[in-house]
Amino acid sequence: MGSGPVPRVGGVRLPALIPLPGAAPLSAAVPAEMAPAAVPAAGAPLVTIVLGTRPEAIKLAPVILAFQADPAFRTRVVLTGQHREMVSQVMELFGLRADHDLALMAPKQTLTHITCAALEGLKQDFAGHRPDLVLVQGDTTTAFASALAAFYEQIPVGHVEAGLRTDNLFDPFPEEANRRLISQLAQLHFAPTEVSAANCRASGVIGEVLTTGNTVIDALLLMAQQAPVYEVPGLDWQRQRVILATVHRRENWGERLSQIGTGFLELLERFPDTALLLPLHRNPTVREPLQAMLGSHPRAFLTEPLDYDQLVAAMRGSTLVLTDSGGLQEEAPALGKPVLVLRRTTERPEAVSAGTARLIGTASADIVAEASLLLTDGTAYEAMARAHNPFGDGQASGRIVEAARRFLGIAGG
């Protein structure tokens, strides 16, 4: 064993339980250099940024702010409505507004519905406000449909967070296919790391590949300028070690989700000084089984999805993060928090190679074993907590704007 148990991490309190209050706008936290500029000339190139999910909103918020701060561009923000409520929270938090909402969200919507509705809605939007460049982010169905809609109209596409790969077309599903397809449609590929850039080039993509860093670090550093103080009734950040957990991926539904919940329960029984903070995804396929398994445990705190500032506060105050989220694999290490990834594959191997994250799968025995090691072995914990975060320096958005300037032939900067 190492140097002893991991100390508790105190000093941050979290939000009230369901429902959570709305977040305050970011206004005071946005640096002056990213504040919106005066309205640009009518003839300035139009950049349309399309998003539909909360992770897209978080990762594109600093990009939107950076384009809005540059008077050489007109910027148009279009929402698909894929995850409307959660996107609205993020937009409000960063002081942003949408120019158009396609309002595609429907009960029990399918991937086919999202794709077809987004294609038709974006065709109409592009016809009324033809962009010179369309930006999409990541690997969502919104991103794929937006890239395809732009391609059909022969509008150049820039892909933020390009080049992530698991090399398993169905894991994660549909994200692995989405990002590969977007790569074949885009002309600007904004890779977060050199590994991602190499993946793009190996795929034979057309256009320019640039290593920019990940925009989620830009968003995280903006949000870290705020110091929110929250409370969860019954959760003692001074006396309890808090495990922050998130689960939502389609491939973890069903039996895997049951295994994950069992692992969480066993950890709580093994470590009486430990609490679990679990923001629940709104999808009932995820939400209801976890509520049934964990809802009655006195040290399992189940909340609605956290606003982004609340999530940052939760990461800062937690001891350990267990997640199947891609974004948290990037964000938590920037705050010195070890990440155990509840998946069998990851499109972010840089985190594993750097030692900031570890793939542990979804078997309850593996969850308990890996988390127990970090909760009892200080040396093992510090090795992960102090490892270098490979995902950037917080300047990715500025690099994307400069690349767009070059691509569109805009002088200066």
What is the meaning of each model-derived region?
Residues T48-L51, E56-A66, V90, D101-G204:
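Active-site and donor-binding regions of nucleotide-sugar-utilizing enzymes
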Residues S3, P7, L14-G81:
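N-terminal subdomain of nucleotide-sugar transferases
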Residues G11, I18, V30-E33, V39, ...:
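C-terminal amphipathic helix plus adjacent low-complexity
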Residues V136-Q137, H159-A162, H189, A313-V352:
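A donor-sugar binding/catalytic signature common to diverse glycosyltransferases
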Residues S88-V90, Q109, Q226-G317:
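Donor-nucleotide binding loops and adjacent catalytic segments primarily
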Residues A42, D125-D132, W237-Q238, F271, ...:
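Glycine-rich phosphate-binding loop signature in dinucleotide/nucleotide-binding domains
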Residues T80-E85, I182-E255, I360, A380, ...:
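A nucleotide-sugar donor-handling region in carbohydrate enzymes
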